Amino acid sequence: MRLTGIHIKSFRAIRDVTIDSVENALILVGQNNTGKSTIIDALRVALGDIAITKKDFNWDGGNIEIALTLELTKDDLKRLCRRGIISRYRKFDSWFEDFQKKLPSFVPMFETDGESINERGELSFCFIANKDGRKRYFDGFKKNNPYIEKLLPRIYSVSPERDIERLQSDLLLLREDALISKMRSGCCLFEEAKTCDHCFSCIGYINQKKPIELDAFEASKLLDYKLYQLNLEEFSKSVNENFKKNGGQDEIVYSMNRNVEQMLQVTTEIGSKTQRQTHTLSEMGEGMRSIYLLSLLETYTEMQEQLSSILMIEEPELFLHPTLQRVAGEILYRLSRKNQVVFTTHSPNLLANFNSREIRQVVLDKQGRSIVRDNTDISVILDDLG
């Protein structure tokens, strides 16, 4: 899943900016204070990564409008179907038919390379927010289509402050296998799109296996069941007997929260080779934090599967000397072959691996408003960056 078209109106210093034909990498270059970060923030707002604030509105207080076009591949669509997003149909053909009804602005596209057909499609919509805090997703058919928000791609963002802990947590989630992801989601053992309601109908299936044969997800369900038996079964039975005796007609259902999120949380510390002590990430120097960030991203590029996410980084070159800046550019290039990358920079050292279609120059017009130049001239950009 990736952005292919962007149109931003009335967001901070942006009056009207259009970026067409966006590829797997979108590199926003320009001098300081030209509005590169503003474009990234606008995308994060429209894609639900950050909330709208009062400072995001122009001086005239008009509505913010951020129109986007998202490309969805066949793998993206199958992933949405498997997770029960947009529609509850389990068979893909039925799911896709319902998907198109609920998202009428989705346009299927079929391309052939002579041997196989590449199935994909584009979804167009406009995020609109007013100064009263109300927001909606307009798709040209419905004033507010609630289904759009359900399929927006995950955003992994890195600000100049280098909030590495958040990015690390996100990337570790991507490295875990499907079983751990299911444990986190709280889904049913038999149906991923269904939320577990602690009916424990899966216990019969689990009991047919030897302990060594259980996977992590099945073992967690068995733990749920044993904890329930230990703590709640008799209590629940007594409460329901008294509830019915006193006129109650429904059933009281108890469940135990094992706080899977905390149980599966990974702690990262920096160990010293010379001293027997560890330090937290927050105690690292700025240069080392940037190097660790690059190491995280490089590990991310080694993942085999294509992921429905967009990585947004402000000034990857920050705190890095020129040699490491070039390394950062190489890592970002490899990363963009896996999924979409959007980053800002005013360092020419990061541009060597990218083509002119992936680089857009951000400048100020005569009124001090941010604009994106239609044609990319690398020599002009390099002169501008110095």
Please tell me what each predicted stretch does.
Residues 1-48, 265-386:
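Switch/communication elements of ASCE P-loop NTPase nucleotide-binding domains
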Residues 40-116:
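Conserved P-loop NTP-binding catalytic core
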Residues 52-56, 140-144, 344-347:
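Short beta-alpha junctions and helix-cap segments that line functional grooves
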Residues 61-66, 72, 122-123, 151-155, ...:
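Short glycine-/polar-rich loops that comprise or flank the Walker A/P-loop
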Residues 68-72, 159-162, 272-274, 363:
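Flexible glycine-/small-residue-rich
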Residues 75-80, 165-169, 350-353, 368-373:
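Switch/connector loops and helix/strand junctions flanking conserved nucleotide-binding motifs
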Residues 83-202:
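A sensor for short, sequence-defined functional sites
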Residues 169-292, 296-310:
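Extended helical coiled-coil dimerization/tether regions that scaffold
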